[in-house]
Amino acid sequence: PSSAASDVYKRQVYEQNRPIQYLYEPLGQSRSLSVHESQSLFFENHIFKSQTYFKIINTIFDNSQDLEKSFLEHYHTVRINPIRVSADEFSYPIHVFIRYQIEKEIFKNKIKFKEIKDLWNKKFLHHLEIDLISDSEGVLQDIHWYEGIFGYFPTYALGAMIASQIKYNCSLFDIFLKNPNEENIKNLVTWLNNN
């Protein structure tokens, strides 16, 4: 699945299971932006990229093709990509780090607006060895800054850490991997909702 599809799926499950009687009170809100991110990243990184999931996909489409192997190779191969949402698990945190560094420079008044693009390009060349060819794969690829959302990027890294902790602490995750049936996925989602 695309990261967008898994992102929407788990966020909706998370939102729909907030306590409705406390919807407009602090108890009814998400714990934090990082916890919110962790919900989609848990599914994206630990369910939808697991060998178990790709075995299911392989049986749905056509057992004669080795889709499982192709999917696993695609999702578990390090390929440096200039686009954050298409980045592999190795370089994704570096994308977040670069944005965080630039935001710090902006808020310390160490950089002018017109210098952001050059700083972005230099950091991508230095950290990821990518020589960017356009602004759409560079400084203009995210919507956060145009919407005035600053300081959000670290929630992606923290969300990934929380998602890994959820995986580690949820015994139902291992049960699902060993026996991926509808009941076990429902039990896993119920556990996430309750915890």
Regions of interest found by a model, annotated:
Residues P1-A5, Y9:
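Single conserved hydrophobic/aromatic residue that forms the stacking wall/gate
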Residues V96, Y100-N195:
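C-terminal, non-catalytic "cap/extension" segments appended to globular domains
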Residues P26-L67:
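Post-HExxH zinc-binding segment in Zn-dependent metallohydrolases
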Residues K10, I60-N81, V85-Y100, E129-I133:
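All-alpha helical catalytic cores of prenyl diphosphate-utilizing isoprenoid enzymes
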Residues K10-Q21:
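Catalytic Zn2+-binding segment of zinc metalloproteases
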Residues I20-E25, Q29, V78-R84, G138-G148:
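Acidic/His metal-coordination segments adjacent to aromatic residues that form catalytic metal sites
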